């Protein structure tokens, strides 16, 4: 049986997921789409989803599909995911699950009332081969982890990008993947601001350093530098009792040319994790065919949202160490 997939939001990521489902993955076909900008929906159908119908609302897409992808504007995610849960439809939601923690909590509560998992959150780094290998190395070879040094660098960001977006749009990936990497929970967060780059603007303090502490005492520093100019660069080094391990660089051809040795650095985030997107969506489709969800859960999205909210508060109080408090984990997510 071919799974009927509906996509809510056909901007860049929604359209790319439609291409992925129809041309790369197996077991599903995009059959319905919607977007607040009909031109986006028409371009998606014309380009990568010729068999899909364009519908007028998220609710219509949910009703017409076996499972849905929520790829719309972040502020719309909560209502659309809740509608999918109410309809009993498996739902893949791009981050953020909700723009604030209380919205993510409502999703967790709704899913709990259904009694089974229906939501997968789009934290694709858990599917990256490099992170998977790093997690295994941390688990088996380094001894207890003590520290993590990480960096998330973008060449540039648009003028509408503001200081809090460094948390909700950028750091959110580190918040999730480092929690997963350590199998640990955060207990505090702190933000400090180094000297600002001349390439930023009045509404954005860049770079930033976020300091996190976990329940097991691991100290984490994450550099967020979204106007670094030179490329899209993700770094992660784990320091354990017995040694250190680093996230591998993306595969690239090293060259010796013109009296120089080097290799290129990617400029686009989509290229850095392109294989991970394929694997995470195939995982979703496999579970959705059974009427459920796999991978990063609504609880993971909630935990990330709580931590992100505290980090934004810490931005407003530079240097202050603020507590991160998670409620008890429901049995559904044990």
UniProtKB/Swiss-Prot annotation:
One of its GO terms (molecular function) is nucleotide binding. It holds the Pfam family GFO_IDH_MocA_C. One of its GO terms (biological process) is inositol catabolic process. The keyword NAD applies. Its EC number is 1.1.1.18. SUPFAM superfamilies: Glyceraldehyde-3-phosphate dehydrogenase-like, C-terminal domain, NAD(P)-binding Rossmann-fold domains. It catalyses: myo-inositol + NAD(+) = scyllo-inosose + NADH + H(+). Keywords: NAD, Oxidoreductase. InterPro entries: Gfo-Idh-MocA_inositol_DH, Gfo/Idh/MocA-like_OxRdtase_C, Gfo/Idh/MocA-like_OxRdtase_N, MI/DCI_dehydrogenase, NAD(P)-bd_dom_sf. It is an enzyme of class 1 (oxidoreductase). The keyword NAD applies. PANTHER family: INOSITOL 2-DEHYDROGENASE, PTHR43593. Involved in the oxidation of myo-inositol (MI) to 2-keto-myo-inositol (2KMI or 2-inosose). Homotetramer. Belongs to the Gfo/Idh/MocA family. This is Inositol 2-dehydrogenase. It comes from Cereibacter sphaeroides (strain ATCC 17029 / ATH 2.4.9) (Rhodobacter sphaeroides). The gene is iolG.
């Amino acid at each position: 049986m071919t799974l009927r997939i509906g996509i809510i939001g056909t901007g860049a990521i929604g359209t790319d997921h439609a291409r992925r489902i129809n041309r790369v993955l197996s077991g599903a076909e995009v059959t319905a789409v919607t977007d607040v900008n009909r031109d986006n929906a028409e371009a998606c159908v014309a380009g990568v989803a010729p068999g899909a119908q364009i519908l007028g609302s998220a609710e219509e897409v949910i009703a017409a599909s076996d499972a849905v992808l929520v790829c719309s504007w972040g502020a719309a995610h909560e209502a659309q995911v809740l509608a999918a849960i109410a309809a009993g439809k498996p739902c893949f939601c791009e981050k953020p699950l909700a723009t604030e923690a209380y919205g993510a909590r409502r999703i967790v509560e709704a899913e709990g009332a259904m009694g089974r998992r229906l939501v997968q959150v789009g934290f694709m780094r858990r599917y990256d081969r490099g992170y998977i290998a790093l997690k295994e190395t941390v688990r088996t070879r380094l001894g207890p982890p003590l520290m993590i040094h990480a960096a998330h660098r973008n060449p540039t960001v648009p003028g509408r990008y503001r200081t809090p977006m460094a948390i909700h749009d950028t750091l959110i990936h580190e918040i999730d993947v480092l929690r997963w990497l350590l199998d640990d929970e955060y207990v505090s967060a702190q933000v400090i601001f180094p000297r600002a780059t001349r390439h930023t603007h009045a509404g954005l303090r860049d770079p930033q350093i976020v300091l996190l502490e976990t329940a097991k005492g691991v100290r984490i520093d994450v550099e967020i530098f979204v106007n670094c100019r030179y490329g899209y660069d993700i770094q992660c080094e784990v320091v354990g009792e017995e040694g250190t391990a680093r996230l591998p660089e993306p595969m690239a051809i090293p060259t010796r040319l013109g009296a120089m040795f080097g290799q290129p650095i990617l400029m686009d985030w989509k290229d850095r994790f392109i294989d991970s997107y394929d694997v995470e969506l195939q995982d979703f489709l496999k579970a959705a065919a059974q009427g459920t969800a796999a991978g990063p859960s609504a609880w993971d999205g909630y935990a990330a949202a709580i931590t992100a909210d505290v980090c934004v508060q810490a931005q407003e109080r530079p240097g202050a160490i603020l507590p991160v408090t998670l409620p008890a984990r429901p049995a559904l997510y044990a």
